């Protein structure tokens, strides 16, 4: 009885052996792909991503915003990547962060959030808007 079980077990292992080799050989395949990539790479083409190519070939005389590729005077002038759904919030150190606009049904509040000239100064109690972000930055995000 034990011999029959052992024989079936051995047969099952032998049957699954080719599949297990492919399953457990991830590292070898990864090294092989890396070697092929380096062998096929043309040094003249370089290793730049399309984003890097656009950034390096841009003729911006000022500052090129990394998220939007807009040409502006200074980093603080960069727009948010999605201005229709984001607020640009100023931080105490002069930098900024883009956050999602708070969801509200109040049209007056929505108009204030949509006003790009002043939306970074808005603070409504109980709402995580730019005022809340600024407050948390001053406190050190401890709460």
Curated annotation (Swiss-Prot):
Source organism superkingdom: Eukaryota
InterPro entries reported for this sequence: LCL2
Alphabetic keyword roster: Signal
Signal sequence range: 1-22
GO-annotated biological processes: ERAD pathway
The keyword Heme is annotated on this UniProt entry: no
Keyword Signal: yes
PANTHER family assigned to the protein according to its UniProt record, in alphabetical order: LONG CHRONOLOGICAL LIFESPAN PROTEIN 2
Chain's role: Probable component of the endoplasmic reticulum-associated degradation (ERAD) pathway.
Family: Belongs to the LCL2 family.
Protein name according to UniProt: Long chronological lifespan protein 2
Organism field: Vanderwaltozyma polyspora (strain ATCC 22028 / DSM 70294 / BCRC 21397 / CBS 2163 / NBRC 10782 / NRRL Y-8283 / UCD 57-17) (Kluyveromyces polysporus)
